[in-house]
Amino acid sequence: MKKKFLCSTLAMAMAASMLVGCASESKTETTAAAGETTAAAAETTAEAAKAETNGEKLKVTLLVTGSFGDKAFNDSAQAGMEKLEAELGDKVEVNMVEMGSDKTKFEGSMLDACESDADLIITGLWDMKEITEKVAQEFPEKKFIIFDTDVDYTLGDLSNVYSMSYKQNEGAFLAGVLAASATKSDMEYANEDNVIGFVGAKDTAAVINDSAVGFIEGAQFVDPDVKVLVSYVGSYVDSATAKELAITQYSNGADVVFVAAGPASVGVIEAAAESKKYCIGVDSDQALAYEGKDEANFIISSAIKGVGDSIYNAVEKAVDGTLPYGEYQILGIEDGVVGLADNDIYQSAVSEDAKKAVEDVKEKLLAGEVTVDSAYGMDEATLKGIINGAQ
């Protein structure tokens, strides 16, 4: 299956392990520069990191939770590291470690990396948050990058850690534009009900609600009258319940459902194929996991987080001495790491008008003409108002 990013240049091998965000489920807004970190201190740290290599290759170790071959975050991270090796091989030395699924061994793997000759250690997801907060202070001479979450810079001296996560609300906004445009189109499985749906994992997870808010706002940007059904599985792994919720939404008129429910998303994809309706995946190009199977034909796109691109960009800055260690940055469309999957199914199944609508809105987002609200820091009353008002 041929694929590309609408908003990225790195062709990533991503699909349906469906790890939705994997960020903290706190509803508290995280600021981009926590604690007492200053721009001057970050610059000094970055320059020190550059000087540490003394003209030698920067030794970079990637630690992934789980294994490669997931066609999702891990494979994307691997692709980013391979791109580094191919394009910056004269400046970096790459090492990649699969930590497996036993969480009790994650800290040991991190300590092993710290005790090695690695200059820069990269890891990600909320499972590694507390470990990074602890170990980074024990090894101040090492540098760290953590993706899809952040560390709490108020806990101590974490000026050697760069945190980055992604504006999933922007990708979800484009998914909403696509869904609302598709339901009004003459696409094969579209109907005339002007109803679309969202199935999320937990209603207590800010990362899930961030996608819900973005999706609803994107849909309403296209048509303020579109109805958006919203359901929550209550779990990241209960695919049976996810399937039931999606079938109910399809039965109630939805012809496109955006799913952000982790591994439970499999149930929504099954429901789409059985109901002969459309779905939109999240985090990775989920159609890749179903290549050659009937289910792939109903996954018209996915809202993607470009982990591989962000790793490449961050390490490139680390090599140049410009990576702002001690800071947390949230990356979006303007950084080229958030967008919709553009593959052969998207090109063949989605109407030209819908594709044009997505492109037009993407340009508006890039130009700053359109902004998307975030569930992070949003009070519960406002959040519920957005969700209930859409239904």
Segments and roles (model prediction):
Residues 1-10:
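Positively charged n-region of N-terminal signal peptides that target proteins for export
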Residues 24-391:
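A residue-level marker of the well-folded mature domains of exported/periplasmic proteins
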Residues 17-21:
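C-terminal motif of bacterial Sec signal peptides marking the signal peptidase cleavage site
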